[in-house]
């Protein structure tokens, strides 16, 4: 979900609009744990640190192909990635007021959540709290982009495409994110740093 956050920050900072390579972000995140050869996931903090250290570039230079997850990005990609880096991110506590503050300030918030079968089958993207006996599927990252205090829900962008939820967006209860057993990581990204990229 860091790619979606970077896309948003580029628009907010009036930088050229393109999609960062998700495969390269994932590779650099796994490299933090010397796990490039394993498709075992990566923490949000590792992916953010990778984008701070190595930068990122257009997905056109390193397209998403899950079969190529263990291949290092090309030299051409690395040269392009040197031109912009993630500049600022912060790990947040499981605190509603803090998360609401970041979202109200226009800062996207990425969360790493535990996914259950009901999440995959959520009608119109309305994600329920898991019930006793629900099948655990694994971990997954979402990008929180808003909240509804009256309904007690976050608006989240998923990475599964427009077929999930409402055009790729869904809502989940505050409790889903605030429970450390259901949400392991909460990270906000506030800025990217362009070194010599012309402004759009």
Regions found by a protein language model. Name each.
Residues 1-8, 30-157, 162-200:
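Predominantly the structural core of cysteine protease catalytic domains
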Residues 7-25:
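Phosphate-handling active-site elements
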């Amino acid at each position: 979900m860091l790619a979606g956050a970077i896309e948003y920050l580029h628009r907010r900072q009036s930088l050229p609009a393109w999609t960062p390579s998700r495969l390269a972000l994932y590779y650099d995140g796994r490299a933090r744990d010397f796990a490039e050869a394993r498709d075992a996931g990566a923490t949000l903090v590792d992916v953010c640190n990778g984008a701070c250290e190595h930068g990122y570039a257009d997905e056109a230079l390193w397209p998403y192909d899950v079969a190529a997850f263990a291949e290092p990005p090309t030299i051409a990609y690395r040269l392009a990635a040197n031109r912009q880096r993630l500049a600022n991110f912060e790990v947040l506590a499981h605190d509603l007021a803090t998360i609401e503050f970041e979202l109200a300030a226009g800062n996207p918030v990425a969360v790493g959540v535990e996914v259950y079968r009901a999440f995959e089958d959520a009608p119109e993207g309305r994600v329920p709290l898991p019930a006793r006996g629900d099948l655990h599927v694994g971990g997954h990252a979402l990008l929180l982009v808003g909240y509804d205090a009256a309904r007690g829900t976050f608006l989240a962008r998923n990475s599964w495409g427009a077929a999930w939820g409402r055009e790729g967006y869904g809502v989940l209860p505050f409790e889903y994110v605030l429970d450390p057993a259901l949400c392991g990581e909460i990270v906000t990204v506030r800025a990217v740093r362009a070194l010599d990229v012309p402004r759009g």
